[in-house]
From Swiss-Prot:
<protein>
    <recommendedName>
        <fullName>DUF123 domain-containing protein HQ_2548A</fullName>
    </recommendedName>
</protein>
<dbReference type="InterPro" id="IPR002837">
    <property type="entry name" value="DUF123"/>
</dbReference>
<dbReference type="Pfam" id="PF01986">
    <property type="entry name" value="DUF123"/>
</dbReference>
């Protein structure tokens, strides 16, 4: 399960290498890499109002339903303002005007959402909002912050690569 870094533009053009945009993607785990341009106050569902610092964010998720990693295309459409339903915690962040979805790191076929989270927790600052994205598991949070979106994307790719090596 080598990590695959995909741009939102490739998904929109249906040219991504695993078929997310074409609706033929397999199930797997993913990390949304988000840049927040400025400190931002926002209401996040039941969490209430939170102030998030500017920087690079990584949101860890998984998609094992009938549409597989096609869920990532929904996130892309929310980030672009094409789909305006806020269903998951991450929707509040990626739909904010100060946020931009810059890349998606995927691990097709791998159910490693919480393993990615655990590894990132040991490498990154504490999650900025406890419980964010982790209401269906025992993880502290599924959202992590770093100084830059490039750094966080590279960390996520490294984590997935290491998890792959340790499972072989």
């Amino acid at each position: 399960m080598n990590p695959i870094v995909i741009s939102p533009a490739a998904i929109a053009a249906e040219t991504d290498p695993i078929g997310i945009g074409a609706g033929t993607a397999p199930p797997g785990s993913y990390v949304l890499c988000v840049n927040l341009d400025a400190p931002t106050s926002m209401t996040i569902g039941a969490h209430g109002t939170a102030v998030l610092p500017a920087g690079g964010y990584a949101y860890v998720g998984s998609a094992f339903g009938s549409n597989g990693l096609g869920r990532v295309d929904r996130h892309r459409r929310v980030a672009m303002g094409i789909h305006d339903v806020t269903h998951w915690h991450i929707d509040y962040l990626i739909s904010h005007q100060n946020a931009s979805l810059t890349a998606i790191v995927v691990a097709p076929g791998a159910d490693i959402e919480c393993a990615i989270t655990s590894s990132l927790l040991s490498r990154m600052k504490e999650p900025p909002l406890e419980g964010f994205g982790s209401s269906d598991c025992t993880c502290t949070a599924h959202l992590f912050i770093s100084g830059s979106v490039t750094h966080i994307r590279n960390q996520c790719s490294t984590v997935i690569q290491e998890l792959s090596a340790s499972s072989n």
